[in-house]
Regions:
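Short, Gly/Ser/Thr-enriched beta-strand-loop segments that form substrate-interacting elements
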Residues: 38, 286-323
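Short, surface-exposed loop or secondary-structure junction motifs
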Residues: 94-304
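Residue-level preference for non-acidic, small/hydrophobic
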Residues: 9, 24, 30, 60, ...
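Hydrophobic (often cysteine-bearing) scaffold residues that line and stabilize catalytic clefts
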Residues: 1, 5, 55, 59, ...
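Short active-site loop at a secondary-structure junction
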Residues: 15-23, 43-101, 137-149, 245-248, ...
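Glycine-rich phosphate/pyrophosphate-binding beta-alpha loops
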Residues: 243-251, 309-321, 334-340
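Short, gly/Ser/Thr-rich active-site loops of penicillin-recognizing serine hydrolases
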Residues: 266, 276-283, 340-364
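A short, well-structured edge-of-sheet supersecondary motif
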Residues: 9-47, 79, 112-120, 295, ...
Length: 364
């Protein structure tokens, strides 16, 4: 697998409408290898092994899920406790468990532009007040509906338990103990890849109500027309939460993501960080195929055996995954939204896994 990393990066980069720049990395007991190809921005600045990327929804696992994993390992929460114990006044059904939110089964809206919410006086509403005012979209614990809003609530819970702003809580619980020096919330400077040019995708979502009906009237928004480098792509994270949220906002390098994922892939060797019974719960698939607590699951082939990978994609073209109990970790970083017709992150991830020899043919 280590020898295939360069081929995997090139396979993703050379797809028709593939990303401008790609970094692929893998870590196993035999070592770690990272390969970079392409450009970090429209000017052609080369992407390097240590280039930081806006990892978008990978933040849900790198920041929020791992913080909850650590808090549960420390005995500061139980995964089946109700969210209202820590964040009162939500619209979640009474008794809705932390684990239910982590499985995206709380019935919340998938997304709403919270920065458009207004008070009765016409002032911008506090985003947490706006979130608490939204009705449920679905019956609670009925089915999975992937929700940014649920992870915004979970990030708020981490703040309430730790008494710290989320960026400091994630640093204290995750990035500092693991030595992830290049991982954290923005804004960031230095060698950072552009994530997109402007806010066009989100503008179109609001204008059309696709894929989700928008519950707020359109307002005056200072849309960004420029190349987004070092400031978060996600509109709610940028405008409503000043770049720090439970659902998005983290910037990271391939090396840091591999270090985190390898720690989790060999969690039994890191019981000071990850309590075994908590780790088993976090990685266990729930009622919905492909969904664990925070993490997603998928079959892969490893050493001729079918194994389960836990992983998570990000809208900007990034992903991280690991095979529990094996020490195997994989990451893909790209700036797919810089392409005129961006390919889905899932396709980029599948292409990388196939080139690495991890694809499970029976799953196709």
């Amino acid at each position: 697998m280590l020898d295939a990393v360069g081929a995997a990066a090139r396979a993703v980069h050379t797809l028709a409408s593939g990303p401008l720049g790609v970094v692929v990395g893998i870590s196993t007991d035999a070592g770690t290898r990272i390969e970079a190809v392409g450009a970090a921005d429209a000017a052609g600045r080369p992407v390097l092994h240590g280039t930081r990327f806006d990892v978008a929804s990978v933040s849900k696992v790198v920041a929020t899920t791992t913080s909850i994993h650590r808090l549960a390992s420390l005995g500061l929460l139980r995964l089946d406790e109700p969210i209202d114990r820590f964040v009162p006044g939500t619209r979640c059904a009474p008794g809705t468990a932390i684990s239910t939110l982590m499985r995206h089964r709380a019935g919340l809206w998938e997304w709403q532009p919270l920065y458009l919410a207004r008070t009765p006086d016409g002032d911008r509403a506090d985003p947490y007040d706006a979130l608490a005012a939204l009705p449920l979209r679905y019956p609670p614990d009925d089915h999975r509906a992937y929700s940014d809003l649920g992870f915004i609530l979970l990030g708020r819970m981490v703040e309430k338990i730790t008494g710290l702003p989320l960026d400091r809580a994630v640093a204290q619980l995750v990035t500092v103990p693991l030595g992830l020096d290049a991982t954290g919330y923005g804004p960031v400077t230095g060698d950072v890849a552009a994530s997109a040019v402007g806010d066009g995708i989100e503008q179109e979502m609001i204008r059309t109500g696709v894929p989700y009906p928008v519950l707020y009237p359109a307002g005056d928004v200072a849309w960004r027309p420029y190349e987004l480098v070092g400031e978060v792509n996600d509109g709610n994270c940028h405008r409503a939460f000043a770049g720090v949220s439970g659902h998005a906002g983290v910037f990271a390098t391939a090396g840091d993501l591999l270090r985190l994922a390898r720690s989790l892939a060999a969690a039994d060797d890191h019981e000071d960080l990850w309590r075994p019974d908590v780790t088993s719960r976090i990685f266990a698939e729930g009622p919905d195929a492909g969904q664990a607590l925070g993490w997603r699951t998928m079959p892969v082939q490893l050493d001729g055996q079918r194994r389960t990978m836990v992983w998570h994609p990000g809208f900007t073209g990034c992903g991280v995954g690991l095979v529990p109990g094996t020490g195997v970790a994989v990451t893909l970083l790209s700036n797919r939204l810089m392409s005129p017709e961006p390919l889905p992150t899932a396709l980029l991830w599948a292409t990388a896994l196939e080139a690495l020899g991890l694809a499970d043919e029976a799953a196709h």
